[in-house]
Regions:
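Aromatic/acidic polysaccharide-binding cleft in carbohydrate-active enzymes
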Residues: 96, 100-101, 107-168, 175-190
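Solvent-exposed beta-hairpin/edge-strand motifs
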Residues: 216-232
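Conserved, mostly hydrophobic/aromatic
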Residues: 28, 136, 202, 270
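Surface beta-strand/loop "capping" patches
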Residues: 167-218
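Extracellular/luminal ectodomains and secreted, surface-exposed scaffolds of diverse proteins
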Residues: 191, 230-254
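Substrate-binding cleft/loops of secretory-pathway carbohydrate-active enzymes
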Residues: 17-59, 63-105, 149-158, 186-191
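Single conserved hydrophobic/aromatic residue that forms the stacking wall/gate
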Residues: 1-10
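C-terminal beta-strand-rich structural cap/linker in extracellular carbohydrate-active enzymes
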Residues: 243-275
Length: 275
């Protein structure tokens, strides 16, 4: 038996152990080397097709990422994994939208690094989460433990910040995806949409003064409220006659009346219950 065959046997035995000794495994995240360069390895070097076949045999429901170099056959992977950047829009393959998950870190390092200072703020992380969902994606967020096996205090602070925001805003994330194209995104906002409840969520990045303009929303909104406290927001579609204190609206536009003071949360969210 040559060296490569021994490697394949070891690999298959380890993969079999992982996929048979720990109950149902939902996801297999492969992270093999690149094919380019003098020491590059391609999908044939790793027998990537064999990995996929074995994984699907042992765990038929499993989903596998696209890092095995098998780009020709869509059956060989289930989702793509852009790392450390945010796609400009829902990623496509052959002009078709595909499932995707962005791989991100709390700081600039995947593992614990004592002297790493480029940590993302709680606000940045929440905006990243909302933007990912608004483009139909999932967010993988890495936390590297210390040599003591605990999380850095900076990571704990940010995890608590995410948890606090999610306590009242999870409905704008879980079960949500990109909004239908008929709903235009207001300025300085992000839209997420739950197709099961038919609710649209407006994540307001910059809090406007008193009014939020929604173009072409007339007849589409049943009720509006802030998610952080479930307080109702009034909205109107017509300009009050004989007043210098109200904005003009387009024929099919809606204006939501906002409190002057921004809600005291990292990212305010308006929930629209649609008609």
């Amino acid at each position: 038996v040559d060296r490569r065959q021994r490697q394949m046997c070891i690999r298959d035995s380890q993969l079999t152990e992982l996929l048979t000794e720990f109950g149902q495994i939902d996801e297999l995240f492969m992270d093999y080397t690149y094919a380019e360069g003098e020491n590059g390895k391609n999908s044939k070097d790793w027998d990537a097709e064999g990995i996929v076949k074995l994984a699907r045999k042992l765990q038929p429901q499993i989903i596998i990422n696209n890092r095995l170099g098998l780009t020709e056959n869509r059956q060989d992977w289930d989702y793509i994994t852009p790392e450390q950047f945010m796609p400009q829009q829902w990623p496509t393959v052959n002009s078709q939208r595909v499932p995707w998950e962005t791989c991100q870190t709390f700081s600039g390092s995947w593992g614990y690094h004592r002297d790493e200072y480029s940590w993302k703020s709680v606000h940045q992380l929440i905006v990243m989460l909302a933007e990912t969902v608004s483009k139909g994606g999932n967010l993988l967020l890495n936390v590297g433990p210390t040599a003591r096996g605990v999380f850095d205090e900076r990571a704990i602070e940010r995890l608590n910040g995410l948890a606090h925001w999610m306590r009242f805003h999870s409905s704008a994330i879980y079960g949500c995806t990109a909004a239908p194209t008929e709903y235009a995104c207001p300025n300085n906002c992000i839209l997420t949409y739950n197709p099961n409840t038919n609710r649209l969520y407006i994540h307001v990045l910059e809090w406007p003064f008193k009014s939020l303009y929604l173009k072409q929303y007339k007849g589409k909104i049943k009720y509006a409220q802030l998610l952080n406290d479930n307080s109702e927001l009034k909205f109107r579609t017509e300009t009050k006659k004989g007043s210098h204190m109200t904005e003009n609206t387009g024929a099919d536009d809606v204006i939501i009346t906002l409190p002057v003071e921004r809600p005291n949360v990292e990212l305010p969210v308006i929930e629209l219950i649609l008609e």
